[in-house]
Structures are given as C-alpha cells and as structure tokens.
Regions:
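Sequence/structural signature of beta-propeller domains
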Residues: 1-308, 312
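Sequence-pattern detector for short linear motifs
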Residues: 93, 314, 324, 353-356
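Intrinsically disordered, low-complexity Ser/Thr/Pro-rich tracts
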Residues: 306-316, 355-358
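Intrinsically disordered, low-complexity regions enriched in serine, threonine, proline
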Residues: 308, 318, 347-350
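Extracellular Ser/Thr-rich, low-complexity/disordered mucin-like segments
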Residues: 310-336
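C-terminal membrane-anchoring or membrane-association module
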Residues: 335-358
Length: 358
C-alpha cells in the first residue's frame, strides 16, 4: 500500500472498487492493488486539519430522486470544509470542486457519514461542536439544504456510520465514537442519543475510540484505516493505510453485521455485536505506534441489491477483476494439460507408424 503524506481519512469504495483518500489537504485514488494516484482535478484545502470525507454509495432505486427534485450521484465525494464558512465541499468524479453547503452555529466540524439506511432521508450527516460537551447533527439533502437534527448530542468525533437493520435496537441510527469518554453513541433521526457501549479501550484526546464501521454483507476483502504521521506524539504514525483481511478477523470471531471500533492512539480494535443486548469483544488490545484517523472502510462486500450495469472506464482493473485471478490460473493450467496430452498422443502415433514401416 502506497504512502500518502498526511493521510487522514479513507472513503468508498467507488463502483470501480477504488478508494478515495485524503492526505495533506489533497485527494487521492487507491486502486484494489494498493497503488495511489492523484484524484482528477486540483482539489486542495487546509493541509494540517482533519477534513474527513464520505463517498456517495449505491442507493436504492426508489430514492435516486429525492423530494428536493435532485439526486446524489454515486461516487461523488463530500468533504468537510474546516475554514470559514464551515460546511461541505462536493467533488465529482472529474475532480470538479464546488461549495455544497454552509453549516452555521458550530465552532468546528467533527464527523461525516452518508445515511445508507434511510431513517435520515438518505442525506449526508455531519456532526459539529455546538457548545461545551455538546454536538450538533445536521442532515444535508442533494440540494444543499441543511436541517438540524439535534444540538444536544454528546461530544463525538471521527469516522461515523449508520447502523444496518441487523444492529438490534440501534438499527438505522448514526453511530459515533467519543475518544474522550471511550464511549460509542447512537443518535436517532428524532434527535435522541443513547450509549451503545463503553469501549473498554484507553481513552482521552488523541487516544480513545476514533472510528466505527460495520462488517458488510458477504464480506470477503479488507478493512482500511488511515494511519497519520503525527510528530511528537506517543503514537507517531506512518502515513499508510492500515489493513486487516476478512479471513483474519473471521478467525477472531468477527461476523457480518458486527460493529468494529478502533482507537486513534495505537489502533486497538473491538467488536460490538447488538441483538437484544450488546456485547463487546476485544480484538486487538496491544497498542502500536499507529495514529488512526477517520473512517473504517471495507472492501469486498457482496451487494444486497443488484449493482448497476458496468460501464466502460479508463481506470485499471477493478477489485472484481482481481477476484477472478484464480479462475484465470485454472483455465491456463487446464489448457496446458490438454496440450501435453495431445503432444503425447502424437508421439505415440509417430512411434507406431515407424514400427509399422520397419
């Protein structure tokens, strides 16, 4: 996996299997083999801040056009704008940047996610600081209209995600971590907040839980987490994307629909499973020198709905193609075997003819 200076978040994957990565105020694309290339266009923003991002996923056909008379375009990137006026920037697949929405009455923006469940109207969800110990949650539709869900949610920051239907009483809520308390919270579309679990991991500024992510349906790939270089910190980071495979986590008891949560300091990891009750299982408890930031992003999920018809693309091979490699090798091996058999038969026939002439 290529190094990306100042890597602070990762999003996607896009329809082509590529990840979108933010580093030092610039966007990058990372292909399924780990090679990084600059994102099209000239996007640039604050180089030392934490401009988290979200990539528009595949949406149900029924909601492609909203009541606002527009639609979110799959693969578009929405990035926190952390300078005045605070808000969101939109970057399309061609790299065109536009100011999408301003979010007033907050002093900072701390997290972003896309509502994949629909309880929030399939909108972009953003958290911001609304006062001492309080967060605002705002929902932004495809027209850039900002609606405040609540201004009294707990302090939260980092990689957020909406819970799937299988996540017990918290299904459809916005799941958000708080590094200071070490707690993981669920924020509902009605503005109410509840604690999902205490992480049991080290807590504090630049230490506690930073990211959450749900193990997707039919997962057979990897989960990625940005490891940012942070000089002078006990967890100095490497500017790489950290990765764990589905096989390695399945061997530790992680299942489809579970919530994973990772810390900022050391990238320790827990598994949270909620049905009628929630249980917390430590997965990685020994802190490393990693300095985690942003989202936990999974590749290699099996779509629940049929994917859109593939379109011609100038991009290199997608993750789906890399997954076909064993089939390619099998066909090659069978073909080689048949060639050997045919050659052997020809040699035998030649010898028999020679004996007949003798």
């Amino acid at each position: 996996m290529a190094k990306i200076a100042g890597v602070v978040d990762v999003g996607g994957p896009r329809a082509d299997g590529w990840l979108v990565v933010m580093g030092t105020g610039k966007l990058w694309l990372v292909d399924p083999l780990g090679a990084a290339t600059p994102y099209p266009g000239t996007y640039g923003d604050a180089t030392t801040a934490e401009p988290y991002l979200t990539v528009v996923p595949q949406l149900p056909h029924a909601v492609l056009t909203s009541s606002a008379g527009c639609s979110f375009q799959r693969g578009d990137v929405y990035v926190l704008r952390l300078h005045a006026p605070l808000g969101l920037n939109r970057v399309d697949a061609q790299g065109q940047k536009s100011a999408f929405a301003n979010i007033p009455n907050v002093t900072n923006l701390t997290g972003i996610a896309f509502d994949t469940g629909g309880a929030f109207g399939y909108r972009v969800l953003v958290t911001g600081t609304a006062g001492a110990g309080k967060s605002e949650v705002a929902a932004i539709d495809c027209a850039g209209t900002v609606s405040v869900i609540t201004r009294s949610a707990p302090t939260v920051e980092g990689g957020l995600e909406v819970a799937p239907p299988s996540f017990g009483a918290f299904a459809g809520t916005l799941i958000a971590p708080d590094e200071l308390s070490g707690n993981i919270y669920a924020i509902g579309a009605d503005g109410t907040s509840r604690a999902v679990a205490a992480s049991g991991l080290p807590k504090g500024s630049d230490i506690g839980v930073e990211a959450v992510g749900f193990v997707p349906h039919g997962w057979h790939g990897s989960v990625y987490y940005a490891d940012r270089v942070t000089k002078g910190n006990p967890h100095p980071g490497t500017d790489n994307l950290l990765a764990l495979t589905s096989d390695s986590l399945a061997g530790l008891g992680v299942q489809e629909g579970d919530l994973l949560s990772a810390t900022e300091g050391g990238a320790t990891l827990i598994d949270v499973r909620c049905t009628t009750t929630c249980t917390v299982q430590p997965i990685i408890t020994s802190a490393t020198k990693a300095h985690g930031e942003g989202h936990l992003i999974f590749t290699g999920a099996t779509p629940i709905e049929p994917s859109p018809s593939p379109r011609a693309s100038a991009q290199p091979a997608t993750s789906g193609r890399t997954g076909d490699a064993p089939t390619v090798f099998l066909v090659a091996a069978v073909t080689a075997g048949l060639v050997v058999i045919v050659l052997a038969v020809l040699l035998v026939l030649r010898d028999l003819r020679a004996q007949g002439r003798g």
